[in-house]
């Protein structure tokens, strides 16, 4: 199994979306890439975490590239700190990885998205922390 962490607005909708994709084995909501180790819904504005979905997938059934293309279908990659009616830094977009080898795949998909849109995207690309 492999995993990737995706932030894209309210995590409940994103989690439901990815839970229905063949090859995705498990999804879990949580918070990522804040200033401290842990947070909760009441503290999130102070800790600067993003609402995030952990996506565990079988790379024999679906590629990271395919997961990212699904991701870009449901987010607005040009919006800063908001998705739809959800506003605030906790609703920012981001792709957070554990495996350094994934960074190259993610960066390639980001470059393709920027070329298609003709703009730099506002999606964070960072290793997972906190």
Residue ranges and their predicted role:
Residues 1-130:
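Flexible coil/turn and secondary-structure edge motifs
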């Amino acid at each position: 199994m492999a995993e990737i962490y995706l932030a894209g607005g309210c995590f409940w909708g994103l989690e439901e979306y990815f839970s229905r994709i063949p090859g995705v084995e498990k999804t879990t909501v949580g918070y990522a890439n804040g200033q401290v180790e842990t947070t909760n819904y009441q503290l999130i504005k102070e800790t600067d975490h993003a609402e995030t979905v952990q996506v565990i997938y079988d790379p024999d059934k679906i590629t990271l590239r395919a997961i990212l293309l699904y991701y870009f279908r449901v987010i607005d990659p040009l919006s800063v700190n908001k998705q739809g009616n959800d506003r605030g830094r906790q609703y920012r977009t981001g792709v957070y990885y554990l495996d350094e080898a994934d960074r190259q795949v993610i960066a390639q998909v980001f470059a393709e998205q920027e070329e298609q849109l003709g703009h730099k995207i506002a999606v964070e690309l960072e290793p997972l922390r906190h």
